[in-house]
């Protein structure tokens, strides 16, 4: 799964075999300098760091992981949810997982926020019913200093009202072919956007979106298109033409990864008991 690609709504997988204890983890990370979530042979990935840290808690035995969303290189997460399968003979509890992994993850910018024991049928990917993302634009003449690698810097003034007018046309179910990466492997381009809100806080323009799942690069491609409309390079009505074109070349550029952050993942029965 990429920065915005989530699970296809497939049949529920069978429960894992016994001999393992499944734990849900909520984690945050700064994606700068990493190769994204998925393990790679030629660099450091978030998944590789997580599994290595977990393995050290059980005498270097393998601890496989599944994530709610595979973020791309440079993309951040404030509330990613994963699950880990620890050997059932390992004497380990929630605090030991959080604090022990926190110790072994240093000095990397990857943190375990919460842990919760779950049943073998619970799956971080397939049990999720929604994912939410935020794309952040720094809208000012001066380049970012403190927020470098966390925002997309746009000098031209952005009209958030125009951006919201365009965004409203993307709500609900649509064929998002124009907004998915050419290499997207999803079987269907149909997705349903539940939320797509744009607001300004001083020099920051935030694009917040929520859906059950997203296509590869969908959020970043929507951000690139909305930027063109907010900067008055395209009219609001252009968004309708782009949707109807079903052609990636019709939409705006793919916004850079550093502005994107996975904010949260939702489940019918939240393992972390959040209200």
Curated annotation (Swiss-Prot):
Coiled coil (UniProt feature): none
Catalytic activity field: uridine(38/39/40) in tRNA = pseudouridine(38/39/40) in tRNA
Residue spans crossing the bilayer: none
Pfam families according to UniProt: PseudoU_synth_1
InterPro entries documented for this protein: PsdUridine_synth_cat_dom_sf, PsdUridine_synth_TruA, PsdUridine_synth_TruA_a/b_dom, PsdUridine_synth_TruA_C, TruA/RsuA/RluB/E/F_N
A molecular function GO annotation: RNA binding
Biological process terms in GO annotation: tRNA pseudouridine synthesis
Active site (UniProt): 72 (nucleophile)
EC number(s) on file: 5.4.99.12
Protein's job: Formation of pseudouridine at positions 38, 39 and 40 in the anticodon stem and loop of transfer RNAs.
Assembly and binders: Homodimer.
Family: Belongs to the tRNA pseudouridine synthase TruA family.
Protein name: tRNA pseudouridine synthase A
Source organism of the structure: Gluconobacter oxydans (strain 621H) (Gluconobacter suboxydans)
